[in-house]
């Protein structure tokens, strides 16, 4: 197991109670990030803020919670930086220069083990309620305040569905048919379906 510095980020409205609680969990550095109007979630502004911190800190592993925001931001960061990503992880183990993660697939019927090389930063999103948080000796993290403004071209990037254009179909889709006629091998030939 590798012992590394733990860095945390809080984006949006800053709650002093949250800062005090983080002191009990071994956080070495804490970035408090405010982005313009904090009660509005802007994916691009949040992404740019996280990328700014990544550039400053050069992390090996970037963890996101399994919340809706975490699931939205994790792939944005990975795609922007071309980092490896593993989602919905229930187990993480660092061994030498490899990261081993486990995650459920096929609606939880199978547990997949993924081995990732730590030659580039890795983005991980955690499955909710899969990890215990152990309190450690309280320490005073190095706190840095970061201010980012929402860029003008980031404020109105909500997609709006205006029209659905369906392709022309020569045959009716089975799911749209009002009557379905089925026959087995006993029909012998497609032309015999008119008997049914």
Residue positions per predicted region:
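N-terminal glycine-rich FAD/FM-binding segment characteristic of electron-transfer flavoproteins
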Residues: 1-196
């Amino acid at each position: 197991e590798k012992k590394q510095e733990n860095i945390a980020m809080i984006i949006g409205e800053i709650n002093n109670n949250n800062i005090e609680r983080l002191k009990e969990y071994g956080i070495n550095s804490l970035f408090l990030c405010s982005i313009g109007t904090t009660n509005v979630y802007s994916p691009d502004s949040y992404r740019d803020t996280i990328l700014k911190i990544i550039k400053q800190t050069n992390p090996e592993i970037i963890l996101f919670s399994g919340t809706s925001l975490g699931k939205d931001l994790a792939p944005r960061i990975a795609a922007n930086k071309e980092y490896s990503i593993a989602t919905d992880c229930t187990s993480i183990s660092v061994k030498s220069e490899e990261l081993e993660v486990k995650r459920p697939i096929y609606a939880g019927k199978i547990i997949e083990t993924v081995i990732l090389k730590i030659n580039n930063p890795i983005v991980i999103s955690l499955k909710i309620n899969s990890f215990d948080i152990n309190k450690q000796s309280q320490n005073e993290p190095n706190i840095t305040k970061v201010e980012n403004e929402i860029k003008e071209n980031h404020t109105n990037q909500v997609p709006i569905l205006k029209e659905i254009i369906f392709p022309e179909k020569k045959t009716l889709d089975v799911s749209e048919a009002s009557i379905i006629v089925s026959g087995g091998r006993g029909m012998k030939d497609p032309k015999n379906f008119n008997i049914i």
